A protein has these predicted regions:
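Short acidic/His/Gly/Ser-rich catalytic and metal-binding motifs that mark active-site loops
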Residues: 62-64, 106-108, 168
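N-terminal capping/small domains of soluble enzymes
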Residues: 1-100, 141, 149
Length: 168
């Protein structure tokens, strides 16, 4: 049995060990982009010796936002994200990002529209009605996931995790 603290090959990426800081919402974004606080947090995790640290809960499009301090993965925030990934890499760790569309859990104020999700119902965070997506909206969100993966690559991330649980 291999040791937890030995290198591990994850696809094309070699992690220095098998420990991963999983994606858990940091609530450290500003204007849906990264902050110095978010960078310092992940750099400190990397400095602590983790094999990979994962930024959490980045929406793939505006309609997928749930919280004010959440990331919205789009080209204009790539420089800030690149600052994080470069700094994490300098500490010897890999950098991942979790992407998703919050669906039934989006907020009217952050998403800028009535929440849309897989089905009609209510947002459990804000008790706001949710409209079920039309086929064209489903297709657009699927395209947004693809764009987000490319944006993550441009920002220097080594991996992408898709968040698709509990109402998303």
């Amino acid at each position: 049995m291999s040791s937890l603290f030995t290198p591990y090959k994850l696809g094309p990426v070699t992690l220095r060990n098998r420990t991963v800081r999983s994606a858990a919402f940091e609530s450290m974004g500003r204007h849906f982009g990264p902050t110095e606080q978010l960078k310092e947090y992940h750099v400190s995790v990397a400095r602590g010796g983790v094999g990979m640290t994962t930024l959490a809960y980045a929406a793939v499009c505006r309609s997928g936002l749930s919280f004010d301090k959440q990331l919205w993965l789009r080209p204009e925030i790539v420089p800030g994200l690149r600052g994080i990934t470069d700094a994490v890499h300098r500490e010897g760790a890999a950098a991942g990002i979790q992407i998703g569309h919050c669906g039934n859990m989006t907020h009217l104020t952050t998403a800028g529209q009535i929440p849309i999700g897989a089905s009609t119902g209510f947002n459990l965070y804000a008790y706001t009605p949710v409209r079920g997506m039309r086929k064209d909206e489903i297709a657009q969100v699927a395209r947004d996931f693809g764009k987000a993966v490319h944006t993550a690559h441009d920002a220097g991330f080594d991996s992408v995790e898709v968040h698709a649980g509990h109402g998303y």
